[in-house]
Amino acid sequence: MRVLVTGAAGFIGSHICEQLLAGGHDVVGVDSLDPSAHDGPPGDLDPGVRWEFRDVRDHDLWMGLLPEVDAVCHQAAKVGLGVDLSDAPEYVSNNDLGTATMLAAMHRSGFGGRLVLASSMVVYGEGAYSCARHGTVRPGPRDPADLGAGIFDPRCPLCGGLLDPGTVTEDAPVDPRNVYAATKLHQEHLASAWARETGGAATMLRYHNVYGPRMPRDTPYAGVMSIFASALARGSAPQVFEDGAQRRDFVHVHDVARANLIALEADPVHDGPLNIASGHPCTLLEAARTLAGAHADLTGEVIEPQVVGGYRLGDVRHITADPTAARATIGFTADVHPSDGLATFAGAELREPPKHRP
């Protein structure tokens, strides 16, 4: 199979390319080398990929390449919370316009192959919760007064009591809480519209907290594990917001890449979203301590994470996945347990941020 991978020079995309090549597939890698992420082509790009350094918003790019490929693995996106709302036009243009341009070209060219789309757990907003009195409930955004008082867990919208967190399934209501999350959900809706109108199928992989080699070093767009690892590399304590008890599911990039390969090869093809997670949630403080302990083993430098109590209004408290559907439909189960993956991540090579960030 010949697969077109977008965002192929990026953190996750580069690992997908490697696993596709190892699986015997041909790979066309498309990447715009956005200057907010790259100074130029990274030195670790696989030479077995046919590289096209162009923008996914370029309609002519798609019309030239789609007749040559059997599947599209769409990873290209501007990621993370960004700096502030002034980033919104860039997020919408890169993520939503880029996806719309791709889908329009797929329709016009009569593309009949597979589509696998990188989505994110951020589409859910807060995770699943239960109230002792009212059962399953969906809390709204947390009250700034509670956050300022150090009450970080969300309250029941019916009685105001504190809630117990659970795992979220793919049929949970969606509630994106920031611009990035809104664009990821819009990407899903656009892909679903394409699938309905053309009789195709779009597999949307909702990644949970991805970490691993080639993560970008500390930037406003980096994941939390990159931020922690960057702090340790500087000899600084990782700063853990709130009380550190917020729960996440950390999934290794090798597993995420493998999930894409499995989705591309699945028979029958799966149409719809799937959680891609380790299935072993932990608290943010536990993850930071695991990373700091592994750093100490490697370097002899003992640095304890600091719980700083601060908060960001766009953050959710707990979001952890139920991975059952991915196992049942495409046969994906994560291989890397976070306790092992985070320990090895302490010695992983991170990519340097661009020297001249726009």
Question: Model-predicted segments: where are they?
Answer:
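C-terminal substrate-binding subdomain of Rossmann-fold SDR/epimerase-dehydratase oxidoreductases
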Residues: 54, 232-358
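A structural alpha-helix within SAM-dependent methyltransferase catalytic domains
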Residues: 21, 66, 103-107, 192, ...
